[in-house]
Design a protein with these regions (language model features):
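Gram-negative and organellar
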Residues: 1-127
Length: 127
């Protein structure tokens, strides 16, 4: 979606349902549901993007715990991105980005948080 007449502000929403199956016992089979939202502002020299994703993974065969009648493994995934990019010329740009990720699961070993900061330059072969 373009949000302004000049076309500088854009937004997008994606909803996905993915089903993964293996060709064996089904141990790696799972279903992922997720929604992604992004907002972007772009000018001749600058690009600013912010976005996030929320999703859930339900495993079909994998369980959590010890004992009888174990619950199926599940995971909730959340991500966020913040990016600022400056075009230096037709091929080079400099950027700064921050990415955050969190997974919550009923399996404590599979739960984590990640914070990532990036600073770099990028070369493009497109003109």
């Amino acid at each position: 979606w373009i949000l302004d007449p000049a076309g500088r502000w854009k937004t997008s929403t994606r909803v996905a349902l993915l089903r993964y199956a293996d060709n064996g016992s089904g141990y790696f089979g799972h279903e992922r549901r997720q929604v992604t939202q992004e907002l972007e502002w772009e000018s001749e020299r600058w690009l600013f993007r912010v976005g996030g994703t929320a999703g859930r993974i339900d495993f079909e065969v994998q369980t959590v715990g010890v004992g009888v009648d174990l619950p199926a493994r599940l995971a909730d995934d959340y991500t966020a991105e913040l990016r600022l990019e400056r075009r230096l010329n037709s091929r080079w740009s400099a950027f700064s980005a921050y990415n955050w990720e969190r997974r919550r699961s009923n399996d404590p070993i599979a739960s984590y948080r990640v914070n990532e900061g990036l600073l770099g330059v990028r070369w493009s072969w497109e003109r």
